[in-house]
Amino acid sequence: MIGKLKGTIDEIGEDHVVLDVHGVGYVAHCSARTLGKLGSAGEAAVLFIETYVREDQLKLFGFLSALEREWFRLLQSVQGVGSKVALAVLSTLTPGELANAIALQDKTSISRAPGVGPKVAVRIVTELKNKAPAFSGEMAPSIGLKQELGEGVAAAPVADAVSALTNLGYSRDQAANAVAAALKNGGEGGDSAKLIRLGLKELSR
C-alpha cells in the first residue's frame, strides 16, 4: 500500500499528475485545487496517497495534506459518492469550507461541485453531520459554529448569513466565526438579516 510519494513533477494533466520517484512515474489523480497548488514540471512535490486496487486496475489518488485525504475517504462513505464525485467536491471546497457547509447543513455550497446534484448534496450534509466534527485543525471554526447552533437554532438563516458574508469578500472561516459569535451574543432565533448585521459588527471589531 502506497501512503505517500515524494519526487519530481514530470507532467500535470487535466485531472492527474505524473510524479517521478527515482525514475518511476506514478500517475496520481487529484482534485483541481490540488493540481492548481502543485508547481511546474521539474519541481519537487510531496503527495499523500490513497491507493485503490481493483481486479484489473490499480489507481492512485494524490492530496497535498493528510486532512484532504481523510475527507476524500469520508465523502465516499456517503451513498452514491464515488472517487469522481469526492474529487469534484474537494475541487470546489477546501476541507474547512466543506466542514462549514456540513455544520450548517448548507447543501447549496456542496451542490456547486460538478456532478453533485441536490439529492447527493443532501445526503452528504445529512450522513456526515455527526462525523465531520471528529476531525480537527482547520475545521475548528465550523465545529464551534455547530456547537453554537445547538438543537434549537434553525440552520437555514445561519447558512444564508454565512453565504452573504462570504459574498461580501470574507472567507468562509471568517464568516462562520462571525455568525457563531453573533449567535452567542444575542442573535439566536433571529432571521438571516439580523445575523448578517451582527456578523458584520463582529467582523468590524
Swiss-Prot record:
Start and end residues of each stretch annotated as Flexible linker: 144-153
Keywords attached to this entry: Cytoplasm, DNA damage, DNA recombination, DNA repair, DNA-binding
Lineage top rank: taxon: Bacteria
Cross-referenced Pfam families: HHH_5, RuvA_C, RuvA_N
UniProt-listed SUPFAM superfamilies: DNA helicase RuvA subunit, C-terminal domain (SSF46929), Nucleic acid-binding proteins (SSF50249), RuvA domain 2-like (SSF47781)
Keyword Protein biosynthesis (UniProt): no
Annotated segments matching region Domain III: 153-205
Region listing for Domain I, in residue ranges: 1-64
Region of interest (Domain II), residue spans: 65-143
SS bonds (residue pairs): none
InterPro entries assigned: DNA_helicase_Holl-junc_RuvA_I, NA-bd_OB-fold, RuvA, RuvA_2-like, RuvA_C, RuvA_C_sf
Gene Ontology CC: one annotated term: Holliday junction resolvase complex
One GO molecular-function entry: ATP binding
Gene Ontology biological process: DNA recombination; DNA repair
Function in brief: The RuvA-RuvB-RuvC complex processes Holliday junction (HJ) DNA during genetic recombination and DNA repair, while the RuvA-RuvB complex plays an important role in the rescue of blocked DNA replication forks via replication fork reversal (RFR). RuvA specifically binds to HJ cruciform DNA, conferring on it an open structure. The RuvB hexamer acts as an ATP-dependent pump, pulling dsDNA into and through the RuvAB complex. HJ branch migration allows RuvC to scan DNA until it finds its consensus sequence, where it cleaves and resolves the cruciform DNA.
Domain notes: Has three domains with a flexible linker between the domains II and III and assumes an 'L' shape. Domain III is highly mobile and contacts RuvB.
Family to which the UniProt record says this protein belongs: Belongs to the RuvA family.
Name assigned to this protein: Holliday junction branch migration complex subunit RuvA
Taxonomy of the source species: Bacteria, Pseudomonadati, Pseudomonadota, Alphaproteobacteria, Hyphomicrobiales
